Regions:
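Terminal amphipathic alpha-helical/low-complexity segments used for targeting or macromolecular assembly
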Residues: 1-67, 209, 215, 224-226, ...
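Glycine-rich hexapeptide-repeat left-handed beta-helix
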Residues: 31-35, 120, 126-240
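Glycine-rich active-site/cofactor-binding loop and its immediate structural neighborhood
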Residues: 76-117
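Long amphipathic N-terminal alpha/beta scaffold segment
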Residues: 47-93
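Residue-level "contact hotspot" at macromolecular interaction interfaces
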Residues: 73-75, 93, 111, 145, ...
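N-terminal short leaders/motifs
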Residues: 19-38, 71-73, 79, 85, ...
């Protein structure tokens, strides 16, 4: 049976609101298959440990400066520089042409793309970082995903644990969405920028190309191509 000229094939359904492809260019990670079973973008956080357990083949091709600590459960690609004073506990998979600066602490279950900067006094745990992202100074990234060319200013904290120890939910404009996760920091979309000393609450979703002003506290869902501005007042008085 042939279609008449007035009939059309059905368009494919758009991906769900929180599908990984709505926030992340999956071509900008060597590990795109880890997202295959993730209906919601945060589902991938449950997969990192098992993915590394079965796929990681430890090897260090990096240029190692001085005597950083690198455990036996680590892969590091060519052209990456690991500076003296860095700690890579692992399991960790680090791509090529990265900078792992002095004082960086890479804990368990970390996947890092190519051309990434992981800086001084930054801590990473159970996270995926896409190609060309930069986290250069004094940040915490736990149970989170950072997209292609995402950037965190100095002192940005992606908080991953609620004060009341309850399950983390994603707060939408209508109703919270249960994640099934007790620890979940943030999804930071491709080319998103977060300014210095911002604090991002657990379960936050930041869309592609969005910008958050320094010193902001944010929780919830920030749509793509947004600017989240902080307005504060200061008052000068005479000192006596």
């Amino acid at each position: 049976m042939t279609l008449s000229s007035t009939q059309h094939e059905l368009e494919p359904a758009p991906p769900p609101m929180f599908a990984p492809s709505n926030f992340l260019n999956l071509d900008q990670t060597e590990h795109r298959t880890i997202f295959d079973n993730s209906a919601q973008v945060w589902d991938v956080l449950k997969q990192i440990g098992s993915y590394l357990q079965f796929r990681l083949k430890p090897a260090v091709y990096a240029r190692v400066m001085g005597r950083p600590f690198i455990s036996e459960h680590v892969y590091i690609g060519e052209g990456t520089v690991v500076e003296n004073g860095a700690t890579i506990k692992g399991p960790a998979w680090i791509g090529s042409n990265c900078e792992i600066r002095s004082g960086c602490y890479i804990r368990e279950n970390v996947i890092v793309g190519d051309g990434v900067v992981l800086g001084n006094s930054c801590e990473f745990k159970n996270c995926i970082i896409f190609n060309d992202a930069e986290i250069p100074h004094f940040s915490y990234v736990g149970d989170s995903v950072l997209g292609y060319q995402a950037h965190l200013g100095a002192g940005v904290i992606l908080s991953n644990f609620r004060l009341d120890h309850k399950e983390v939910s994603v707060k939408t404009e209508t109703t919270p969405i249960a994640t099934g996760l007790r620890k979940f920091g943030a999804i930071v979309g491709d080319r998103a920028e977060i300014g210095c000393n911002a604090v991002i609450s657990p379960g936050s979703i930041i869309g592609r190309n969005s910008l958050i002003y320094p010193l902001t506290h944010f929780g919830g869902v920030l749509p793509e191509n947004s600017i989240l501005k902080l307005r504060q007042e200061t008052h000068r008085v005479e000192r006596h």
